[in-house]
From Swiss-Prot:
Binding site for K(+): 120, 185, 221
Residue ranges of domain YjeF N-terminal in the record: 65-275
Function: Catalyzes the epimerization of the S- and R-forms of NAD(P)HX, a damaged form of NAD(P)H that is a result of enzymatic or heat-dependent hydration. This is a prerequisite for the S-specific NAD(P)H-hydrate dehydratase to allow the repair of both epimers of NAD(P)HX. Accelerates cholesterol efflux from endothelial cells to high-density lipoprotein (HDL) and thereby regulates angiogenesis.
Name of the protein: NAD(P)H-hydrate epimerase
Chain positions found as N6-succinyllysine: 144
Length: 288
């Protein structure tokens, strides 16, 4: 194991149990208005619960999420990199609200960002860059890099900000628990279908054994977009982008934020998204 540490250039391990970190983090996030009420928690009675259910933000199917994305690109002429920048900033902001640097035991707090090969991975790269600006020390693991100018540019931006990239994934959950205070899951998004293949199958297996919190971007990797978890990772923070997906009703973590404040009002009305009122200039809204 000492050879692996030397290879990764990660330095000495910091002692301390995960339990103490959880106690520090509990209640550290500013309390916000709660907009989201999972349908599975609503009783059959009438009254306030029914009003909250009728006013709740809409949960999108995979087909609906793809349709909204296509309209943003085609009808409204947003570019991929434009939405990726806004989404990644939202993710970093939600993380900073849920886990402020002062609530964590290290200075700067160490964060491992694991990026997949698609747009979700691009969101993770942008998120890592903003986390560095917010006072965290991110490290990126990006095993499958698409040969496209957009992603090459995002990698360069992170490198220019002295954000390290790992050559290999730490193989044991305990090692990640000792080296990092948070893991960002930016592996798969809502467009993913089919079986999880290597190296991501092994990565998810390691993540399943972590005790440090996981923050998932849009969809917890390994989850069905509509049905939710089938024994996959259980994030502590979920950042839904544009609008929550149906799988979010199965989320049981402590923090659920909505990010991506870029939906035109006409598009929101067309799909009846019923998005919550973002306060002032905030780019995220706490749903749970």
């Amino acid at each position: 194991m000492s050879g692996l540490r030397a290879l990764l250039g990660l330095g000495l391990l910091v002692a301390g149990s995960r339990l103490s970190r959880v106690r520090v983090q509990a209640g550290s996030c500013r309390a916000g208005a709660t907009w989201w009420v999972p349908q599975r928690l609503i009783s059959g009675g009438r009254g306030d619960s029914e009003v909250m259910a009728s006013s709740a933000v809409k949960y999108l199917s995979q087909e609906e999420a793809q349709a909204v994305d296509q309209e943003l690109f085609n009808e409204y002429q947003f570019s991929v990199d434009q939405l990726m920048e806004l989404a990644g900033l939202s993710c970093a902001t939600a993380i900073a609200k849920a886990y402020p640097p002062t609530s964590l035991s290290r200075s700067p707090p160490t964060v491992l960002v694991i990026c997949g090969p698609g747009n979700n991975g691009g969101d993770g790269l942008v998120c890592a860059r903003h986390l560095k600006l917010f006072g965290y020390q991110p490290t990126i693991y990006y095993p499958k890099r698409p040969n496209k100018p957009l992603f090459t540019a995002l990698v360069t931006q992170c490198q220019k900000m002295d954000i390290p990239f790992l050559g290999e994934m730490p193989p044991e959950p305990m090692l990640i628990d000792e080296l990092y205070e948070l893991v960002v899951d930016a592996i798969f998004g809502f467009s993913f279908t089919g079986e999880v293949r290597e190296p991501f199958r092994s990565i998810l297996s390691v993540l399943n054994g972590l005790t440090v919190p996981i923050a998932s971007i849009d969809i917890p990797s390994g989850w069905d977009v509509e049905k939710g978890s089938s024994g996959g990772i259980q994030p502590d923070l979920l950042i839904s982008l544009t609008a929550p997906k149906k799988s979010a009703t199965q989320f049981t973590g402590r923090y659920h934020y909505l990010g991506g404040r870029f939906v035109p009002p006409a598009l929101e009305k067309k799909y009846q998204l019923n998005l919550p009122p973002y306060p002032d200039t905030e780019c995220v809204y706490r749903l749970q």
